[in-house]
Amino acid sequence: MESTPSFLKGTPTWEKTAPENGIVRQEPGSPPRDGLHHGPLCLGEPAPFWRGVLSTPDSWLPPGFPQGPKDMLPLVEGEGPQNGERKVNWLGSKEGLRWKEAMLTHPLAFCGPACPPRCGPLMPEHSGGHLKSDPVAFRPWHCPFLLETKILERAPFWVPTCLPPYLVSGLPPEHPCDWPLTPHPWVYSGGQPKVPSAFSLGSKGFYYKDPSIPRLAKEPLAAAEPGLFGLNSGGHLQRAGEAERPSLHQRDGEMGAGRQQNPCPLFLGQPDTVPWTSWPACPPGLVHTLGNVWAGPGDGNLGYQLGPPATPRCPSPEPPVTQRGCCSSYPPTKGGGLGPCGKCQEGLEGGASGASEPSEEVNKASGPRACPPSHHTKLKKTWLTRHSEQFECPRGCPEVEERPVARLRALKRAGSPEVQGAMGSPAPKRPPDPFPGTAEQGAGGWQEVRDTSIGNKDVDSGQHDEQKGPQDGQASLQDPGLQDIPCLALPAKLAQCQSCAQAAGEGGGHACHSQQVRRSPLGGELQQEEDTATNSSSEEGPGSGPDSRLSTGLAKHLLSGLGDRLCRLLRREREALAWAQREGQGPAVTEDSPGIPRCCSRCHHGLFNTHWRCPRCSHRLCVACGRVAGTGRAREKAGFQEQSAEECTQEAGHAACSLMLTQFVSSQALAELSTAMHQVWVKFDIRGHCPCQADARVWAPGDAGQQKESTQKTPPTPQPSCNGDTHRTKSIKEETPDSAETPAEDRAGRGPLPCPSLCELLASTAVKLCLGHERIHMAFAPVTPALPSDDRITNILDSIIAQVVERKIQEKALGPGLRAGPGLRKGLGLPLSPVRPRLPPPGALLWLQEPQPCPRRGFHLFQEHWRQGQPVLVSGIQRTLQGNLWGTEALGALGGQVQALSPLGPPQPSSLGSTTFWEGFSWPELRPKSDEGSVLLLHRALGDEDTSRVENLAASLPLPEYCALHGKLNLASYLPPGLALRPLEPQLWAAYGVSPHRGHLGTKNLCVEVADLVSILVHADTPLPAWHRAQKDFLSGLDGEGLWSPGSQVSTVWHVFRAQDAQRIRRFLQMVCPAGAGALEPGAPGSCYLDAGLRRRLREEWGVSCWTLLQAPGEAVLVPAGAPHQVQGLVSTVSVTQHFLSPETSALSAQLCHQGPSLPPDCHLLYAQMDWAVFQAVKVAVGTLQEAK
């Protein structure tokens, strides 16, 4: 006997003698035995083959093929029982093969006909029915559970693959049934791509998804190789027997170069009069999913359109029956179940031919439970039982799996929204119960209901595949570079995820490599992810579209900005409930009414959760007003009669005793959300400033030791020197955030700060002053919290130095004009070369060249500047704006309200019509005569009749995660649609230009917006030639130098102040403006414009400077809430403004709403729901981070 081939060395030789394996030889020329059934082979039928190493003389290999040794190769020494491996006490008494854990070989094809053409099938051991005591024997590659063992993971090499005879050239005619070993070009034994194991899907067969392999249901037929699909030269389908058979077989598993056409057609064509044998729907190498690739009638998929189910004609003398795949070669039944095969089809022959049998009985017979149990199913059941938790297999094994009809009925009874998706109708966009934590939900109610309107579609992948079956044919479309196999199938050197590690008996939680390891489509080599920018775009990058899912990076950003506020709200809730209990009030009643106004009837503040309401009307009181009204509750109960139902009106008032304590969300749900949020904080190292996070160890019971070690590790104190080393400043900047968050007991353990000389003290103090509050950029005393070990003299010197250098730091940080940042080069010149962005110096503005910047660069830079309260200029919007929608010809037909704006007062309505306004828009000589000290404006809200403009605006908005109504970082997207969102609708503003000699006028007076604002300049008139010189002189006289460059069409000038300077500006306006003109109320129209002289006085006398932004057509200016700003149009312009609610300014917006008494009712209704929007956003963020690995 020849030696074992090189590609078989080191592989386990699983061989048994013929009696052990249940192989019964068949003499040549003997007639077939009774009881043989063709079609898909049942898992219990005997077969003499495993991995190409045979023990019988009449092997399936061609003559002369090297045979393996007779003795069985022992297992690897030192390997104990692992997941899926054999148990000696269980398998010791069983006949047949002994099992070792098997893994999928990528991408081996376990599909093939049970009896190829002119093949003499193997004889089973028994001629009767399917006995349960049959020993285990397998036909090559018909069983998807005998796979390559883990021993083959040691080193990559060519793995022998068994191919059907019609794909191998040179097969001898005396062995027409042989399935020779052939090196498969796609097979590798290194790290395997992540494929859900065959054992995890139960009776649905194995599930394989590989984007590099052509798909049967969606890919066109022309994309495949004609020789592989059994096509002739003309591209038409070829029937069996029309092509010549191969004539040469190469030794050592090498394929001949002159391979003939494939005689087995891949797809079944139209029925023919010539009888032919049914063949598999995909050859080896095209592995598909039994449950969701085959298309049914009406699906429109290619797999069904190519031909109807055919009735094959097998060499067996039995009558033909309809084949239904039990292996991956055959399509399942329409209901998604698997049909009978082999011996299991014996009992269905009579029932399948009769047409009068009920369909339910046919479904029962053709379901996956029709196969009687055997030794192999016991093996599979045990394996599934062990791994049911890992692979989320319901109830452990397929024998107890419910049929699809019963499962749908159960879901329908339970009110599951998946029934609608399975039956074909779309699920509702917003569930009927959007308020979690009601009495019906109980524990865990905060995360049971997910708001689908904000793109939070949480679908369990395991249940999704199990329930939808063949209707979810596109569920396997994922990133072609990510691995698709479970962690247990990875090489031993790679770490496993937490669930896989626990299943293997290991401890600790490891991050799964499925999100970090990529593979080449055909090479089969694993490589570590190196492009962090590409990887972060899917995890941390912003999502676009109303139905996109919240990414991990955005969830962290939401939680870091809103978590502290939610903690304060929850603490206020606990205090309110504790006070109500002390007052003797009953338990709070949970109310579930989405349309009720969440506003206090007395102070018009927002209602978060706990409040008092009248059970007979809509009268409600917040916590503060409820306490005031509850002081006389005891007196009312003692001496006064309670209010009757007839007297319950708004005019008559409500007695305190008639109000009832009410909640929108139960206290239990809020407590669970608070616990989950703090655990996510600890898990992702998100820093919070709430008192609850002072000791984070209480929120992480399993990681108490690690948290203790992390709190003990403090950064070393930098050693200052007198030589002015720049590295010292850098180290202090990097370590200051960490040291500022350390607990007091850890700071006390540090030694005294080394300050041996006055020079070192001055240097360290100056650095601390420059690292003051980010939003203020000014010195303050004391600069840092006093340390227990600090000397009193050191604190006094810090205060003195802070007072001396405070004004200089202010002037440097709040310098006038537009400073050169990473996106600018001297004003409005050309942008800088594309280099890695760096954090700009304090006071510099950000100019984004792209409306949707890269997640790792421009987007994070915007968040940094936006967090500091700075405006941002965005260019490049003109590429998406449609000029025909925003021109004067298109806008002239629209109506609008014309207003006259003066420098000292709010805009006043004008008697001019919109047609007259648009006639003088581009021609000053045609403009109506008006006061020299006023400018005409036109305002219009874009409503339903402006659908095309609204859609174009939505597609052109910069940073849609913030500015768009469905943006994940826009808190308005977490509120239900209604009248409350009306203040956020886009507004159209058109204004005449201000001539250079009228610099004291503006097109928008100084005002403060309650919400964040984005203003896009959609159209600007061309300035006259005589204005260029005057315009240049006017721009050169603005604050700062180099703000204007020749060639750029500057249309508007923005002056933006910091929100912290609003109070100083109010006091300055009260001094320089007439009575009533200096008011700067939030949300009210501006009543004063600051010209160059007033801005200079404000800077010199009050130390308040402003940023100057020059806006051109196709650019947008983003202004944070609370920042005073004014606009001056140099030419006639048309702009569109839209408000949004960002997490960074949500707290300031709520505060400004209470300070603005002149806000319209719609604005009060919007900002009254800010706390509820914060709750919804935090709930979605916590749910996303809990599911993240």
From Swiss-Prot:
Keywords: Disease variant, DNA-binding, Hypotrichosis, Iron, Metal-binding, Nucleus, Oxidoreductase, Transcription, Transcription regulation, Zinc, Zinc-finger. Residues 239-254, 457-469, 725-736 have a biased composition (Basic and acidic residues). It is an enzyme of class 1 (oxidoreductase). It comes from the Eukaryota. Changing V1056M: Markedly diminishes histone demethylase activity. A motif (LXXLL motif 2) lies at residues 758-762. GO terms for molecular function: chromatin DNA binding; histone H3K9 demethylase activity; histone H3K9me/H3K9me2 demethylase activity; transcription coregulator activity; transcription corepressor activity; zinc ion binding. Strongest expression of isoforms 1 and 2 is seen in the small intestine, weaker expression in brain and colon, and trace expression is found in liver, pancreas, spleen, thymus, stomach, salivary gland, appendix and trachea. Isoform 1 is always the most abundant. Isoform 1 is exclusively expressed at low levels in kidney and testis. Isoform 2 is exclusively expressed at high levels in the skin. A zinc finger (C6-type) spans 600-625. Its cofactor is Fe(2+). Fe cation binds at C1007, E1009, H1125. It catalyses: N(6),N(6)-dimethyl-L-lysyl(9)-[histone H3] + 2 2-oxoglutarate + 2 O2 = L-lysyl(9)-[histone H3] + 2 formaldehyde + 2 succinate + 2 CO2. A motif (LXXLL motif 1) lies at residues 566-570. One of its GO terms (cellular component) is histone deacetylase complex. One of its GO terms (biological process) is regulation of transcription by RNA polymerase II. It holds the Pfam family JmjC. Contains two Leu-Xaa-Xaa-Leu-Leu (LXXLL) motifs. The LXXLL motifs are essential for the association with nuclear receptors. The JmjC domain and the C6-type zinc-finger are required for the demethylation activity. Histone demethylase that specifically demethylates both mono- and dimethylated 'Lys-9' of histone H3. May act as a transcription regulator controlling hair biology (via targeting of collagens), neural activity, and cell cycle. It is linked to Alopecia universalis congenita: A rare disorder characterized by loss of hair from the entire body. No hair are present in hair follicles on skin biopsy. Atrichia with papular lesions: An autosomal recessive disease characterized by papillary lesions over most of the body and almost complete absence of hair. This is Lysine-specific demethylase hairless. It comes from Homo sapiens (Human). The gene is HR.
